[in-house]
């Protein structure tokens, strides 16, 4: 548990929103509308054919997709792609497979890919849960990122949260031994739930020690985005949870 002397402020969220038509059918997104800018539309046309992947429902061959053998990191819900592009730029030796359904967000990341000349990102504009179920082979991932998923603040909506035991079991099974799962949230009750769910998964081991209550220091590769800085100014805490596959 995290000690707090003041009420937890409402959280903002950037990536990995979640929706559900039934508690047993959790998706990795909530349907949102938004305008695609001229620059984003141009990025779809100019670089989309190279960096957008079609959902096939068939197991992926990462070597064929990226044209090389390299560690592959899954990202679920990247918002407008600010952190994604930053991390991919820091780690050109790694492949990044990024799932997001929000069209302006996909367009924004494509624009960043073009502007920063990134070559190690591929995007699937599809529900990440279905991608995990049908396209990611067991033991194929070197890591997974879920940054600021929709916290679904109301107790009656908690069942809609993305990070629950069934999804984590699927993700853990798709990590290689030594692969990691990194989650971050600015909503204290969700941080507690994430820690509880990951701690209960037998394939995963916490990288943090007891002195930190199970929460990890922010890894250096994860940037403070405009979204996160805005939250900090509003008094939000941010909790990182990092587990590895045993």
Curated annotation (Swiss-Prot):
Disordered: region residues: 1-23
Pathways involved: tRNA modification; N(7)-methylguanine-tRNA biosynthesis
Annotated active site: 150
Keyword Transferase (UniProt): yes
Role summary: Catalyzes the formation of N(7)-methylguanine at position 46 (m7G46) in tRNA.
Family per record: Belongs to the class I-like SAM-binding methyltransferase superfamily. TrmB family.
Name used for this protein in its record: tRNA (guanine-N(7)-)-methyltransferase
Species assigned in the record: Polaromonas naphthalenivorans (strain CJ2)
